[in-house]
């Protein structure tokens, strides 16, 4: 609370700004108000104490206030006391308002007051600033009044900062404001003087300063809970104050005399409370304006954060005790007041182990892990964080320790001391909260990120944290929840942590488990966590993480990021916290997660530091991405866990969804699995994982691990998808199991892979077998190697963000893998920073390369058969890519099958698990391809297609690892969040709604459908002949996923024909385009995968023939990767995001499930229809394909196109979902991108962004992330797609013209921005292409908008919209509108130009947006 006041005073924004606190206020349980009131009561009590002290001093409390000025004057001189002075100022403020009351409470409470008062205000006024839990709890209610006055007074500072009125009040009250500035002399105005002196900046109102001063540590700790953010938020003054307080606090000892004088003068309160303050957060409001509570040696500011294993006795007030074993308390420690929710360890194993001797050991571990306890620096904030953590934890009831911890805990409570003390047990407890095991490794941090999405539900606080890896960073501190306060129940026997570098001792096994899950499982992923931000989406993974909450949960889980899926939100249940946290955004998840307990823990793990929580979180976040966290208690605990593990800070990333969404971004993301899981039936788990990704670096990585399990269960989840909560539960449970498996797996990716495999096997025996065959032993082996590499990579290179994305990616992949174990394997393996990479690299690439090189035929047949079987099977269907693989033979199969899962996950989620997996792997691969393939494309353009894919595989494998950090950060992060979105587009109801309400959408949809039908007919016939209905169905499924791609596919088919007509060279290029067209659409969709798209684009640009070969090869291999990758990513972003949105809500999940089936039916039916229609086009298509591509290209391309055509067909059949999604996606996308961050990714998931996945996360990130994520890719991808698109579009408009322009631009952009620009320019130039391609693929964003608008505006509308959506990905809001509306058409070139410029700039935008 103090923090609050600090925020209040320090933060001009105090009253409201305490968004953190507000968030605290929001506490899901409503404990916020309770806590606030309790704080107020505490404050009153303490005020009484202080007043007594004051009276002792000889100043009645009222007088104290009135006299306080004089007292304060005395105190004023005390610079050190100023911290207390801050409080005293509070008092003064109080005195201003409440002359009598404020003395004790005020001075001490200034922060408190600010906090308590604010708290009350918040509670009452809704003053979030009151978060300063420090004194808030302690500050008397009078203090509250005073706080208000104080706030006014303290506002002085604040006034400067924000509330001048209060300042004025304070000034009025504190006549000596002028003297405030006098450090030693507070005489002029006790109130102002002190503040002034304390806060040089707030000469007038030291309220904030004084709170800081009075809290010397409190400002940082209590005040800073909010203060940390407040430092940032209150920032100018608060920060300064904090710093001053810190320095002065340090000086405080020197100032102590002044402080003592304050005690003497103002009240003994200082004396009274001095010791209590130390003991009780009461901070003895040393009302004596000079309440120095003298920076006692015991003050954290002076002492620094309490070491984790420290056993402490806390004095406090019990605000509430529930029958379910939850205790809400305000405790004073080191003169800082912490509000926390304590859980009965007999009932809540997941709660931070109260028996952990070194509850903060996790924090320390975090530190060791690399986050270095980001919070620690702001040692004060930690409490807040802790509180927040507990809040996040999902101490649903007033877990709101956040109140005590100050809502800003997540990010704000970065102060170690604050966080630390409570951390002592909290951290551990929180960590334990994940059920200790794997749930909360530092994944939670990532998850937190993802949770960001999910945290959305938590409120900005969590979101803040989630959305920012840094917030997550502080999370660790937050984790420590004041609630835990005395959690470190001494245990007779201390259990030593077996970890080599860990010397933590825990009294309770849960503490150890929590610690291990958190610190050590995270250790591998911690770096990831560090780099990572979470969902998240769910971004995505974020985004998927991305994701988001409630819906978020979906986002966070699937939408979980929604947040991301981010995915950021956590459930109240302790175990749920992780998942809850992930889903926390989803209030639902809260309880479900809590119900899930261990499973949830796993999920929570995904959400939290653990893989499980991470997954959820990532996804949520995502996308990655955010439901889990909101599980209040669980969520809080978990979130704290998430936060706790510096992973989140690590993950400051990311979304992931997983984020990621995962998200999703999300989420992200949770960045971010959860998100995906929620988002799509198939990808639901993945989403959640991603979200626990969305959007969820380290956590995401872990989420990824759980993801395999999730993926294994995706189908199960799919059914669960309908009930987002149930699904999340399942996902969480599965994730939990996965995570638990992965917990160990984290260290051993092999295990992970196995785990992933096992779940996947369960999920898709065929898919898994197929994957196994495809990947063969090499896959597992490579997977492990890749995992290891990824782990190392994420630890070193990507540590912070990459892991999260990885997780997001992994989550997604894993989700994807429900059908394809390999993907999960990869996901699992990739778990770390290399989830996608590993997948792509090890399984996809390795398999493709191994299968392709060693046994293409083998792969082909195996894959073919497997693919067919898979297709036949629901999961197999998801594996439609295997069919394409058969088409593309070894490579395509490898990639398709491999990617397909991703793909499936990406769009349909459950529908195309393999597709999604493909997306994941492809996203990674594209990224990987970006470098290798770009190089290869250029260098090896002439090399055979096969060689190139192989090379791509091999070279990209390492590249992936190398790029993994980027990829993961970007792709995974995005995936985290993006994943969340992947489902969004599927929403039938939304589609229907749009159709009914949005004429433009309906028109576009109809156009798209028609276009799709025609093109699908053209290709469909061919494909049917080629692939057969089944393959086509699979393709359709994939098409769904790539529905944005589908238009390109459609475009491609016509384009191919036209291109072929254009000329052999051109035809060839178009051939490549078609091949790429297929890919490109996907690339477009997965703009985030710039590598591949750009590479393809470059290759195409470099050599049409080459491109043909490469396209054909790449198509099978890279393209497959691209398609799956980009498309999936894009799909995640565009489709998944909308889909996630759609599914952000349970309805979404149902939709996914029903849509899956419905799509299947539609696909079959439409496939048949298209067959008849296609027959006409087929010849064209065949000729086109044959002409366009090399022999392989024609076959693989055709196959691809076939599969893709079927996708268009699917698009047509699924047109409602798909087309709607295309149109819908743009809208949804725009939505996602606009609001998806929170709703989607954070939401959430990521929504990835579910982060959405992140993303930064899924939400915006989902689209933004998408843009940033695939920003490079976006351009390249789009260009690629555009290229492919142009083939199609060009055919409609001017193929040759488009191609020429394409080439022109390609060369232009090539030199300019080869990877992205090329494609982008091509794509843009390829306006015509954009028509079909644009509609089909986002890549047409620019091109479709520009070229297509003239040629096929109607058709382009949806396409353009998609493109715009893609564009949106790059430029969240900008394209959104154009995409949504026919602006692009109307905008024409300008829009295209903008898109081009945006896409061109996307790369630059890309990283930032991603983050």
From Swiss-Prot:
<feature type="compositionally biased region" description="Polar residues">
    <location>
        <begin position="798"/>
        <end position="844"/>
    </location>
</feature>
<feature type="modified residue" description="Phosphoserine">
    <location>
        <position position="452"/>
    </location>
</feature>
<feature type="modified residue" description="Phosphoserine">
    <location>
        <position position="846"/>
    </location>
</feature>
<feature type="modified residue" description="Phosphoserine">
    <location>
        <position position="758"/>
    </location>
</feature>
<feature type="compositionally biased region" description="Low complexity">
    <location>
        <begin position="952"/>
        <end position="963"/>
    </location>
</feature>
<keyword id="KW-0804">Transcription</keyword>
<feature type="modified residue" description="Phosphoserine">
    <location>
        <position position="433"/>
    </location>
</feature>
<feature type="modified residue" description="Phosphoserine">
    <location>
        <position position="849"/>
    </location>
</feature>
<keyword id="KW-0832">Ubl conjugation</keyword>
<dbReference type="GO" id="GO:0007517">
    <property type="term" value="P:muscle organ development"/>
</dbReference>
<dbReference type="InterPro" id="IPR040010">
    <property type="entry name" value="ZN608/ZN609"/>
</dbReference>
<feature type="compositionally biased region" description="Basic and acidic residues">
    <location>
        <begin position="519"/>
        <end position="529"/>
    </location>
</feature>
<comment type="subunit">
    <text>Interacts (via N-terminus) with NIPBL. Interacts with INTS13; promoting association with the integrator complex.</text>
</comment>
<keyword id="KW-0517">Myogenesis</keyword>
<feature type="modified residue" description="Phosphoserine">
    <location>
        <position position="470"/>
    </location>
</feature>
<comment type="function">
    <text>Transcription factor, which activates RAG1, and possibly RAG2, transcription. Through the regulation of RAG1/2 expression, may regulate thymocyte maturation. Along with NIPBL and the multiprotein complex Integrator, promotes cortical neuron migration during brain development by regulating the transcription of crucial genes in this process. Preferentially binds promoters containing paused RNA polymerase II. Up-regulates the expression of SEMA3A, NRP1, PLXND1 and GABBR2 genes, among others.</text>
</comment>
<feature type="cross-link" description="Glycyl lysine isopeptide (Lys-Gly) (interchain with G-Cter in SUMO2)">
    <location>
        <position position="1153"/>
    </location>
</feature>
<keyword id="KW-0862">Zinc</keyword>
<feature type="compositionally biased region" description="Basic and acidic residues">
    <location>
        <begin position="751"/>
        <end position="764"/>
    </location>
</feature>
<dbReference type="GO" id="GO:2000291">
    <property type="term" value="P:regulation of myoblast proliferation"/>
</dbReference>
<feature type="compositionally biased region" description="Gly residues">
    <location>
        <begin position="1328"/>
        <end position="1337"/>
    </location>
</feature>
<keyword id="KW-0805">Transcription regulation</keyword>
<feature type="region of interest" description="Disordered">
    <location>
        <begin position="1005"/>
        <end position="1125"/>
    </location>
</feature>
<feature type="region of interest" description="Disordered">
    <location>
        <begin position="1153"/>
        <end position="1221"/>
    </location>
</feature>
<feature type="compositionally biased region" description="Basic and acidic residues">
    <location>
        <begin position="626"/>
        <end position="649"/>
    </location>
</feature>
<keyword id="KW-0217">Developmental protein</keyword>
<feature type="compositionally biased region" description="Polar residues">
    <location>
        <begin position="549"/>
        <end position="563"/>
    </location>
</feature>
<keyword id="KW-0539">Nucleus</keyword>
<feature type="region of interest" description="Disordered">
    <location>
        <begin position="1270"/>
        <end position="1367"/>
    </location>
</feature>
<feature type="modified residue" description="Phosphoserine">
    <location>
        <position position="358"/>
    </location>
</feature>
<feature type="modified residue" description="Phosphoserine">
    <location>
        <position position="533"/>
    </location>
</feature>
<feature type="compositionally biased region" description="Polar residues">
    <location>
        <begin position="1286"/>
        <end position="1296"/>
    </location>
</feature>
<keyword id="KW-0010">Activator</keyword>
<feature type="modified residue" description="Phosphoserine">
    <location>
        <position position="413"/>
    </location>
</feature>
<feature type="modified residue" description="Phosphothreonine">
    <location>
        <position position="746"/>
    </location>
</feature>
<feature type="region of interest" description="Disordered">
    <location>
        <begin position="679"/>
        <end position="963"/>
    </location>
</feature>
<dbReference type="GO" id="GO:0006357">
    <property type="term" value="P:regulation of transcription by RNA polymerase II"/>
</dbReference>
<protein>
    <recommendedName>
        <fullName>Zinc finger protein 609</fullName>
    </recommendedName>
</protein>
<dbReference type="GO" id="GO:0008270">
    <property type="term" value="F:zinc ion binding"/>
</dbReference>
<feature type="region of interest" description="Disordered">
    <location>
        <begin position="517"/>
        <end position="659"/>
    </location>
</feature>
<dbReference type="GO" id="GO:1990841">
    <property type="term" value="F:promoter-specific chromatin binding"/>
</dbReference>
<feature type="modified residue" description="Phosphoserine">
    <location>
        <position position="804"/>
    </location>
</feature>
């Amino acid at each position: 609370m103090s923090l609050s006041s600090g925020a209040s005073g320090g933060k001009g924004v105090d009253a409201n700004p305490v968004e953190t606190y507000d968030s605290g206020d929001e506490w899901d349980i409503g404990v916020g108000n309770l806590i606030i009131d309790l704080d107020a009561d505490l404050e009153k009590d303490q005020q009484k104490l202080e007043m007594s002290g004051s009276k002792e001093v000889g100043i009645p409390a009222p007088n104290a206030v009135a006299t306080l000025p004089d007292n304060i004057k005395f105190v004023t001189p005390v610079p050190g006391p100023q911290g207390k002075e801050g409080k005293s100022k509070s008092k003064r403020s109080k005195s201003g308002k409440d002359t009598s009351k404020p003395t004790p409470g005020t001075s001490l409470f200034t922060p408190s007051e600010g906090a308590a008062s604010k708290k009350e205000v918040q509670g009452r006024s809704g003053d979030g600033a009151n978060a300063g839990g420090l004194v808030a709890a302690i500050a008397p209610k009078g203090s509250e009044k005073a706080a208000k006055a104080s706030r006014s007074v303290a506002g002085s500072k604040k006034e400067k900062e924000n509330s001048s009125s209060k300042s004025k009040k304070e000034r009025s009250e504190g006549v000596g404001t002028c003297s405030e500035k006098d450090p030693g002399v507070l005489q002029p105005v006790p109130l102002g003087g002190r503040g002034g002196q304390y806060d040089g900046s707030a000469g007038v109102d030291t309220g904030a300063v004084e709170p800081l001063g009075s809290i010397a540590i409190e400002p940082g700790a209590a005040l800073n809970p909010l203060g940390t953010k407040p430092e940032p938020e209150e920032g100018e003054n608060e920060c300064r104050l904090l710093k001053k307080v810190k320095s002065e606090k340090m000086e405080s000892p020197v100032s102590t005399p002044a402080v003592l004088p304050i005690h003497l003068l103002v009240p003994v309160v200082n004396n009274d409370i001095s010791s209590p303050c130390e003991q009780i957060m009461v901070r003895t409001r040393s009302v004596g304006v000079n309440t120095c509570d003298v920076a006692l040696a015991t003050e954290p500011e002076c002492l620094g954060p309490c070491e984790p294993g420290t056993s402490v006795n806390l004095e406090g007030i019990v605000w509430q005790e529930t029958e379910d074993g939850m205790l809400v308390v305000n405790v004073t420690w080191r003169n800082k007041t912490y509000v926390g929710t304590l859980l009965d360890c007999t009932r809540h194993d997941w709660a931070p182990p109260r028996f952990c001797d070194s509850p903060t050991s996790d924090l320390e571990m975090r530190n060791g892990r690399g986050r270095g306890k980001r919070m620690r620096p702001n040692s004060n904030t930690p409490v807040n964080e802790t509180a927040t953590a507990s809040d996040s934890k999902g101490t649903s009831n007033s877990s709101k320790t956040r109140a005590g911890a100050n809502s800003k805990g997540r990010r704000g409570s970065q102060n170690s001391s604050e966080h630390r003390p409570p951390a002592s047990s909290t951290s551990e407890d929180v960590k334990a909260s994940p059920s200790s095991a794997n749930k909360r490794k530092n994944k939670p941090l990532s998850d937190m990120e993802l949770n960001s999405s999910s945290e959305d539900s938590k409120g900005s606080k969590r979101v803040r944290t989630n959305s920012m890896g840094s917030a997550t960073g502080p999370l660790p501190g937050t984790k420590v929840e004041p609630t835990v306060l005395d959690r470190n129940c001494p245990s007779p026997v201390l259990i030593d942590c077996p970890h080599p570098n860990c010397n933590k001792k825990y009294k309770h096994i849960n503490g150890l488990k929590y610690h291990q899950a958190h610190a050590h499982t995270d250790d591998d992923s911690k770096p990831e966590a560090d780099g990572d931000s979470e969902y998240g989406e769910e971004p995505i993974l974020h985004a998927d993480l991305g994701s988001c909450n409630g819906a978020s949960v979906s986002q966070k889980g699937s939408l979980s990021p929604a947040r991301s899926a981010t995915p950021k939100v956590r459930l109240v249940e302790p175990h749920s916290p992780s998942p809850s946290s992930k889903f926390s955004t989803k209030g639902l998840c809260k309880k479900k997660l809590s119900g899930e307990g261990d499973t949830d823990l796993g999920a929570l793990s995904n959400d939290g530091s653990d893989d499980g929580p991470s997954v959820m979180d990532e996804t949520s976040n995502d996308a990655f991405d955010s439901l889990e966290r909101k599980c209040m208690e669980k969520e809080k605990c978990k979130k704290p866990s998430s936060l706790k593990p510096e992973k989140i800070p690590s993950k400051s990333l990311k979304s992931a969804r997983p984020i990621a969404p995962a998200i999703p971004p999300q989420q992200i993301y949770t960045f971010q699995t959860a998100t995906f899981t929620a988002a799509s039936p198939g990808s639901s788990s993945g989403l959640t994982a991603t979200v626990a990704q969305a959007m969820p670096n380290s956590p995401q990585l872990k989420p990824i691990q759980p993801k395999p399990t999730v993926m294994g269960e995706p189908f199960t989840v799919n059914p669960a998808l309908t009930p987002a909560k149930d699904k999340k539960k399942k996902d969480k449970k599965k994730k939990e199991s996965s995570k638990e498996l992965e917990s160990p797996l984290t260290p051993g990716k092999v295990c992970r892979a196995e785990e992933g495999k096992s779940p996947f096997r369960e999920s898709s025996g065929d898919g898994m077998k197929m994957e196994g065959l495809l990947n063969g032993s090499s896959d597992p082996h490579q997977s492990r190697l890749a995992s290891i590499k990824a782990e190392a990579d994420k630890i070193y290179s990507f540590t912070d963000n990459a892991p999260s994305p990885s997780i997001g990616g992994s989550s997604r992949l894993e989700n994807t893998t429900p059908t394809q174990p390999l993907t999960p394997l990869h996901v699992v393996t990739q778990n770390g920073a290399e989830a996608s990479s590993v997948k792509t690299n090890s399984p996809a690439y390795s398999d493709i390369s191994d299968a392709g090189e060693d046994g293409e035929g083998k792969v082909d047949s195996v894959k073919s058969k497997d693919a067919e079987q898979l297709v036949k099977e629901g999961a197999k269907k998801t594996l439609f890519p295997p069919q394409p693989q058969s088409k593309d033979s070894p490579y395509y199969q490898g990639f398709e099958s491999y990617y397909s899962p991703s793909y499936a996950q990406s769009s349909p989620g459950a529908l195309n698990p393999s597709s999604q997996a493909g997306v994941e792997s492809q996203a990674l691969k594209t990224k990987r391809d970006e470098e290798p393939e770009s190089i290869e494309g250029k260098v090896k353009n002439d090399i055979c297609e096969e060689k190139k894919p192989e090379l791509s595989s091999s070279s990209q494998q390492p590249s992936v690892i190398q790029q993994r950090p980027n990829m993961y950060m970007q792709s995974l992060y995005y995936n985290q969040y993006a994943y969340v979105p992947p489902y969004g587009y599927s929403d039938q109801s939304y589609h229907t709604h749009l159709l009914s309400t949005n004429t433009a959408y309906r028109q576009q949809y109809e156009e798209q459908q028609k276009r799709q039908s025609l093109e699908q007919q053209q290709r469909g016939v061919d494909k049917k002949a080629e692939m057969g209905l089944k393959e086509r169905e699979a393709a359709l499924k994939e098409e769904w996923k790539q529905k944005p791609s589908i238009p390109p596919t459609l475009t491609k088919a016509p384009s191919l024909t036209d291109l072929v007509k254009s000329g052999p060279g051109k035809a060839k290029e178009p051939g490549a385009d078609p091949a790429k067209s297929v890919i490109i659409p996907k690339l477009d969709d997965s703009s985030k995968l710039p590598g591949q798209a750009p590479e393809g684009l470059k290759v195409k640009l470099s050599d049409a023939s080459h491109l043909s070969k490469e396209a054909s090869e790449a198509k099978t291999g890279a393209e497959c990767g691209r398609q799956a990758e980009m498309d999936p990513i894009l799909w995640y972003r565009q489709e998944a995001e909308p889909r996630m949105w759609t599914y952000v809500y349970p309805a979404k999940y149902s939709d996914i499930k029903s849509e899956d089936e419905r799509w299947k039916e539609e696909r079959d039916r439409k496939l048949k229809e298209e067959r008849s229609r296609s027959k006409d086009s087929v010849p064209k298509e065949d000729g086109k394909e044959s002409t366009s591509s090399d022999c392989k290209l024609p076959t693989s391309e055709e196959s691809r196109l076939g599969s893709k055509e079927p996708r268009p067909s699917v698009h047509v059949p699924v047109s409602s979902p798909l087309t709607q999604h295309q149109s819908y996606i743009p809208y949804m996308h725009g939505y996602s991108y606009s609001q998806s961050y929170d709703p989607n990714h954070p939401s959430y998931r990521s929504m990835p962004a579910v982060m959405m996945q992140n993303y930064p996360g899924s939400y915006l990130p989902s689209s933004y992330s998408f843009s940033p994520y695939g920003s490079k890719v976006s351009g390249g991808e789009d260009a690629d797609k555009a290229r492919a698109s142009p083939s199609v579009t060009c055919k409609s408009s001017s193929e040759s013209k488009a191609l020429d322009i394409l080439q022109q631009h390609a060369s232009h952009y090539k030199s300019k921005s080869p990877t992205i620009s090329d494609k982008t320019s091509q794509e843009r130039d390829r306006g015509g292409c954009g028509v079909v391609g644009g509609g089909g693929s986002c890549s047409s964003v620019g091109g479709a908008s520009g070229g297509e608008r003239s040629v096929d505006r109607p058709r382009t509308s949806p396409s353009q919209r998609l493109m715009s959506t893609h564009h949106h990905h790059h430029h969240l809001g900008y394209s959104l509108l154009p995409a949504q509306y026919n602006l692009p058409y109307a905008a024409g070139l300008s829009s295209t130009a903008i898109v081009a410029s945006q896409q061109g700039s996307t790369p630059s935008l890309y990283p930032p947006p991603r983050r």
